Swiss-Prot record:
Lineage: Archaea, Methanobacteriati, Methanobacteriota, Methanomada group, Methanobacteria
Species of provenance: Methanothermobacter thermautotrophicus (strain ATCC 29096 / DSM 1053 / JCM 10044 / NBRC 100330 / Delta H) (Methanobacterium thermoautotrophicum)
UniProt superkingdom: Archaea
Homology family: To M.jannaschii MJ1453.
InterPro entries: DUF447_C, DUF447_N, Split_barrel_FMN-bd, UCP018747
Name of this chain's protein: Uncharacterized protein MTH_863
Length: 223
C-alpha cells in the first residue's frame, strides 16, 4: 500500500525521503504520461490537490495540460510553482477528484507544499505557459500548456513506480481478448479500440507494440 495513508486512518503519517537529482530516480521516461497528484497553493499557502497527468519530457522537465477555470491552473499561473506527487493510493485519487483534501494532508518542504506521505514527489517551477483551444469529440475547451523544470526529487522507501495507464490498457485488452469467443465482436472491437487510444496517448513504444499485436491477433480470431 502507498505510504500516503494508513488503512482506515484520517491523517497520513510523515515519511522520510531521500533526495535525488533528476526524474530517472522515479523511473519516469521521456514521452510517457504519468498519473500523479499535483499540489498547488495560494498566497496564504492553502493547499490544493488534483489528479493530473504529467508528461515527462526529459530528465528534469515535464509538461502539464491544465484546463481553464480550475484552482490548479489559477495557483500555477499566480506563483509559478507546484509539486508533482507519486502515490498508488486509490483513495487519494478519489478524494482529490470528488472534493478537497483536508489541510493535514499537506506538508511543507522549503517554500513548497506536497502531499503528506506521498511515495515520492518533486518540486517544479514553471518555464513557460501557452494558452490554446482544444477541440475534440466533446467540443471546445481552453487549455494551458505548462512547461516546467523539476527541482528537488524526493523518494521514500515505499516508492514502487509512477502510474502510467498504458500497461493497464494492455492488461484490459488481454482480458477482453481471452473472452473474445463469448463477446459481441462489435462491442469487443470498440473496447479494444478505446484501450488502444489510451495506450497510444500515454504509453511508450512497448505498450503500443503490445496493442498492435493484440489487435492483429483479435482480428484473426474473430474475422
Amino acid at each position: 500500500m502507498s505510504g500516503a495513508l494508513k488503512e482506515n486512518s484520517g491523517k497520513p503519517s510523515e515519511v522520510e525521503y531521500t533526495h535525488f537529482k533528476d526524474l530517472q530516480a522515479l523511473e519516469m521516461e521521456r514521452g510517457r504520461l504519468y498519473e500523479t497528484i499535483v499540489v498547488t497553493w495560494d498566497d496564504s499557502m492553502v493547499g490544493n490537490a488534483a489528479p493530473i497527468g504529467v508528461l515527462c519530457t526529459g530528465d528534469d522537465t515535464v509538461t502539464l495540460y491544465l484546463y481553464q477555470g480550475t484552482r490548479t491552473v489559477e495557483n500555477v499561473l499566480n506563483n509559478g510553482r507546484f509539486t508533482v506527487n507519486v502515490t498508488l493510493d486509490p483513495l487519494i485519487f478519489t478524494d482529490s477528484t470528488l472534493g478537497d483534501l483536508e489541510e493535514d494532508m499537506f506538508s511543507h518542504y522549503r517554500d513548497f507544499l506536497h502531499l503528506r506521505g506521498a511515495d515520492a514527489f518533486f518540486t517544479a517551477e514553471v518555464v513557460s505557459v501557452k494558452k490554446l483551444v482544444k477541440r475534440d469529440r466533446f467540443g471546445e475547451s481552453e487549455l494551458h500548456v505548462v512547461k516546467a523544470r523539476a527541482g528537488d526529487v524526493m523518494r521514500a522507501e515505499s516508492f514502487r513506480m509512477a502510474l502510467n495507464r498504458g500497461i493497464y490498457a494492455v492488461i484490459e485488452s488481454l482480458i477482453a481478448y481471452t473472452r473474445a469467443e463469448f463477446s459481441d465482436p462489435l462491442v469487443l472491437r470498440e473496447r479494444i479500440a478505446e484501450m488502444n487510444r489510451v495506450a497510444r496517448k500515454v504509453g511508450g513504444p512497448r505498450e503500443k507494440e503490445a496493442m498492435r499485436r493484440i489487435i492483429q491477433a483479435l482480428e484473426s480470431k474473430i474475422s
